[in-house]
């Protein structure tokens, strides 16, 4: 389940300190390349941005670029991995702010996503965008996308299980569908649709939770 902060990490430079140990660039130069790629890939699209354009934006030589990222696809994988790590860290922070209150985490997520997905500069979910540009489901880029989607469903299922739902995984999959739709609606609708996107996500999410609530389970979200 992607926290609202993911929208900010998607089109802003990815700070190496936010990327997590598994994807932290090996050097400041690699971090600069990754930051330049993050801005360009998200704003203009992956296929539309050449390696030469990233090299120019990062102000590095071709030799330096390819030393850190042997191919453009390797750079795309590194970028998406950094975004995924930042999103997971952001959700960890939200959960830490509401210990033991899964309902509060879900409600806060709905409100935050409505705001973030409608702000100027938002270009949709970077993982959905990447999947649209890489048709081969076996491509390494699609593998990163698939892993992040599994994480979203698993995280949402954990929160929903805490609410006593009889099918938390099924409910989680439905919430992720709502999340995807909200991000598209926010991108197309713009800032003036923020309240509507948040309200729709909140109300539809509550309906999903209600539909999967085990009989006799107290209403907490």
Regions found by a protein language model. Give the residues of each.
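Generic hydrophobic, amphipathic alpha-helix propensity
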Residues: 29-37, 54, 79-83, 87, ...
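Secondary-structure edge/capping motif, primarily at the C-terminal ends of alpha-helices
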Residues: 98, 134, 186-190
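Amphipathic alpha-helical packing segments from all-alpha helical-bundle domains
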Residues: 88, 104-107, 137-162, 173, ...
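Amphipathic alpha-helical segments used for helix-helix packing
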Residues: 117-140
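Helix-turn-helix
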Residues: 2, 32, 39-74, 78
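Hydrophobic/aromatic-rich alpha-helical bundle segments in the mid-to-C-terminal region
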Residues: 141-146, 161-221
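N-terminal intrinsically disordered/low-complexity leader segments
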Residues: 1-28, 213-221
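Hydrophobic alpha-helical connector segments
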Residues: 78, 92-121, 172-175
């Amino acid at each position: 389940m992607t926290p609202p902060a993911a929208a900010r990490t998607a089109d802003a430079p990815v700070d190496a300190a936010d990327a997590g140990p598994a994807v932290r660039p090996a050097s400041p130069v690699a971090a600069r390349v990754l930051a330049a790629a993050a801005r360009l890939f998200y704003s203009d699209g992956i296929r539309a941005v050449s390696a030469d354009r990233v090299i120019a934006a990062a102000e590095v030589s071709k030799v330096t670029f390819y030393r850190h990222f042997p191919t453009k696809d390797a750079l795309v994988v590194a970028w998406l991995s950094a975004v995924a790590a930042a999103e997971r860290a952001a959700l960890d922070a939200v959960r830490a702010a509401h210990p033991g209150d899964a309902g509060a985490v879900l409600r806060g997520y709905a409100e935050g996503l409505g705001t973030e997905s409608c702000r100027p500069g938002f270009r949709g979910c970077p993982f959905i965008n990447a999947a649209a540009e890489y048709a081969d489901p076996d491509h390494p880029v699609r593998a990163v996308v698939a892993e992040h989607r599994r994480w979203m469903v698993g995280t949402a299922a954990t929160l929903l299980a805490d609410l006593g739902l009889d099918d938390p995984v099924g409910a989680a999959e439905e919430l992720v569908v709502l999340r995807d739709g909200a991000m598209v609606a926010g991108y197309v609708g713009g800032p003036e649709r923020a309240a509507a996107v948040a309200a729709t996500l909140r109300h539809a999410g509550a309906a999903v939770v209600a539909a999967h609530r085990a009989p006799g389970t107290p209403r907490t979200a």
